[in-house]
Design a protein with these regions (language model features):
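TRNA-recognition modules of translation machinery and tRNA-sensing kinases, especially anticodon-binding
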Residues: 131-427
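N-terminal alpha-helical targeting/anchoring segments
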Residues: 1-136, 154
Length: 427
């Protein structure tokens, strides 16, 4: 949720960020108008409260309290009633009041972009930061992962469709073993980098989804149980970020570094006709997520470290990739700055996203009320939250199939993975 104090202090920055995202910036004027209305109502309530307190004190100091009370009571009652109405009205207009128009605007306004984010409207204007590895040159025409997997009997899309419909896959034999091995490999790397492993619930409340910025903006993309009002997580970012919701952390506890391996569930409602074959875009997929809770002044350094943790996994798996800084129009609703890691896919002769690493600054923490107290006498302040995949398991698996394929259709796995799989080749 956007910080009302930031909009008050620097409305031009909020306008500029919106325009850079390709959004009409007129909402900033509406926020300021509603905020002025709220502060005017608050000032009126405070003025009436002061008058009420003054009259009460006057009665208390009178020599003849009974006479003073009889004389001033009608006026005191009238002011008290007016104050109660004014106070109720001001509270209803407050930026943190449920149902207030001001809160609704702040909730549906994307995060303020960091100044380092480049201008641009779409993915073709993202900026290359660095690249690692050299895409393999094949002596034969490389096949897509779904053809390789079906021929090897490790990916079964036909039976998955029989069970669940489109955008599902059954992993079999060494395919299922490879998925499990990747999860262990990623979790071990995260543990070595200082992350605490969490096994969170896969169903979360509406409040949890809202607190991490998934609702109401992305409600159409979620699988939910309306009767129980529970949502299947679209990413472990949701329960990991909200884990410390409503808490005040000690400064010494920061940064909090969490990781989880979970299935994730998404409707992919806006992806009709895109990536209809294979593992790229599934309704259910596995992922290892990294989440940081950081001191505000450290969060952009933390983003570099989190991104480096995700990159290290790709390097150990010997997968060529590139790191892209997302442009303004491609940066997500919650994020102030995002790096995408894109892995090389030979069959497409292009790079595809395998991880997205974001600094959400205080945007999610403000919703979830995650704060830090630096000093016993200091006022708590919101932490900054960061998240990234390290990595998406299905997309890593398909990248391994495509990049490790041999002319005979077998797959050679990277050396770092063999202790986890127990085999170095799928044939």
């Amino acid at each position: 949720m956007l910080d009302i104090a930031l909009v008050r202090r620097d409305p031009d920055r909020a306008r500029q960020s919106a325009r850079r995202r390709g959004i009409d910036d007129s909402f900033v004027d509406e926020i300021l108008r509603l905020d002025t209305q709220y502060r005017s109502a608050l000032a009126q309530a405070e003025q009436l409260k002061a008058q009420k307190n003054q009259l009460s004190a006057q009665i208390g100091k009178a020599a003849d309290k009974a006479a003073a009370a009889q004389e001033l009571r009608p006026r005191l009652d009238a002011i008290s009633a007016a104050f109660a109405l004014a106070d109720e009205g001001a509270r209803a207009l407050a930026p943190d009041a449920l149902g207030s128009p001001l809160r609704a605007l702040l909730e549906n306004t994307p995060n303020i972009l960091d100044d380092a984010v480049p201008d641009g409207s779409g993915s073709d204007e993202n900026v290359l930061v660095r690249a690692w590895g050299t895409p393999r040159v094949f002596s034969f025409e490389p096949k897509p992962h779904y053809e390789l997997g079906e021929a090897l009997g490790i990916l079964d899309f036909e039976r998955a469709a029989k069970l669940s419909g489109s955008r599902f896959c059954v992993l079999r034999n060494k395919g299922a073993q490879l998925q499990r091995a990747l999860a262990r490999f990623f979790l071990d790397r995260a543990a070595a980098a200082g992350y605490e492993e969490i096994a969170p619930p896969l169903l979360v409340t509406r409040e949890t989804m809202w607190s991490t910025g998934q609702l109401s903006k992305f409600s159409d993309a979620m699988f939910a149980d309306p009767e129980a009002d529970l949502f299947m997580i679209p990413t472990a970012e949701v329960p990991l970020t909200a884990l410390h919701g409503g808490e005040i952390l000690d400064a010494a506890a920061l940064p909090v570094k969490l990781t989880a391996h979970t299935p994730c569930f998404r409707k992919e409602a806006g992806a009709a006709g895109k990536d209809t074959r294979g593992l790229i875009r599934q309704h259910q997929f596995e992922k290892v997520e990294l989440v940081w809770l950081s001191a505000p002044e450290e969060s952009f350094n933390a983003l570099e470290r989190l991104t480096a943790d995700a990159e290290a996994a790709l390097q150990e798996l010997e997968l060529s990739y590139r790191t892209m800084l997302l442009c303004a129009g491609d940066t997500s609703f919650n994020s102030a700055k995002t790096y995408d890691l894109e892995v090389w896919l030979p069959s497409a002769n292009s790079y595809r996203e395998i991880s997205s690493c974001s600094n959400c600054t205080d945007f999610q923490a403000r919703r979830a009320s995650i704060r830090v107290r630096r000093d016993p006498r200091a006022k708590p302040e919101f932490v900054h939250t960061l998240n990234g995949s390290a990595l998406a398991i299905g997309r890593t698996l398909l990248a391994l199939l495509e990049n490790g394929q041999q002319a005979d259709g077998s797959i050679v796995l990277p050396r770092a993975l063999v202790p986890y799989t127990g085999f170095e080749r799928i044939s």
